[in-house]
Amino acid sequence: MSSVGTALAKTPLQPFGTYCNQPRLIQAMEARGLDGMVITNPLNVYYLSGFNSIAHKSDEPRPYAVVISRHSPEQPIMVIADYYLSTLAALQGPITDIRPFRAVMMPMDLPPAAADIERFIDQPTAAQNWISGARENYRFDMKSALLGALSSVGLKTGRIGFDDLGFGLRLRLDGVDAADAYDAMMFARAVKTPAEMQLLQQATALNEAAIERSRADWTPGITWREMDRIYAGHVNDLGGFVRDPGGMVWGHPRGADSALVLSTSNDNTPIEAGTHVMFDCHGTTALYCWDGGKTWVVDDEPQGLAKQLDGATQRVAETMLAAMKPGARISELQALGRQTYRQCGVADGDQAIIFFHGLGLSHMDIETTTADGQ
C-alpha cells in the first residue's frame, strides 16, 4: 500500500462533534426559527452521527433518521431499522439513544412481536450500554419510532425542519409545522472543522497520486474510456472511491477547437499526443470529496503560446490564493484573476474560465437560500 493509502487506513473514525460544526448548526436553527430537525439525507446523517448506511441507492426511502432539538442539542436520537443495530454497535458512535423499528428484513406473513428485535442483537451488540433502551423503544414501523423520539425531546409540536421536506410532509404530524432544513444543514457544513480539513487534505493527496499514476500509464492509442478506468483503478488501490460513471476528465482544447468538453467513460476516442488535458476528477474518501486535478500536455511540454498561458495561469492561481480571505467574493476573485492575466500579457482575459471547486461531503456545501430569504 502507498503512503497515501496507509495514511487513510490508519485514520481513526472521529467522534460526534468533530465533523459536525455544532455552533453553526444551532445558529442555523435559531436563525430559521426551527425548534428541531429530523435529518434523513445519508450525508447529513453521517455528518451528525458517523453512521454510513450500506448499499442504498439515492432515490430509496431512508430507514433511519437523526432527531435533534435546538433546546437540548446534546441529546440527539437515532431512529433506525432493526437490521442496522450491529452496524451501530461496531461504530460505537456518539449517539447512544437508539430507537429501532421493525423493517423489511422481518417476514410480512408473521405478526410483529417485541421479540423480533432479538434477531439482530449479537453478542457485541448485547454488550452496548444503550441496548436496553433500544429494546424498550422497539416499534413496528418507522413513524411510530419517530413519534416517540420527537416526544422524548419535546418536539411533539413546533416548527421542525426536515432536510427532506417531502418526507416531513408525508408523515402528516399533528401540531407540527414542517419546514425545509436543507439550507440549515448546509449552513453548518459550509465551515469545516479541523477533522474535516484533515480528511479533505487526505482526499486531495489521494487524487493527486491517482492522477500521477494514470498519466504514467498513458501509451499511444489509449482512449478516454480506458483512462477513466485506469484512474478509477488507481483510486481504488489507494483506498478511495469513484462513483459510477467515474471521475470526470476535461479535455481542452482539441486542436483548434477551444470548446470545453467533458470526456468520461462514454468517450472511446484515443487521447492523442500533444493534447492539452485538464484532469477534473471526482471521488471520495470516508465520504469526503476531492474535486479537481492538474493540467497535462500528453507526452509533451507546453510550447509557444501554451507555455505563456501556463506561466500566466500559475501567476493567476498564486494571486487568487493570496486573496482568498474570509469575506472575499467569488466574483471579486475572478475579476482579480482576469486582471492578472492581462498583467501577464494575455490578450483576452475575459475568455478565461475561472471556476472554483467545492469540497466537503458534497461539492456544494452551501446554502441555496439564506435565513433571511436571500
Locations of the language-model features?
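Active-site neighborhoods and metal-handling regions in enzymes and metal-associated proteins
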Residues: 1-374
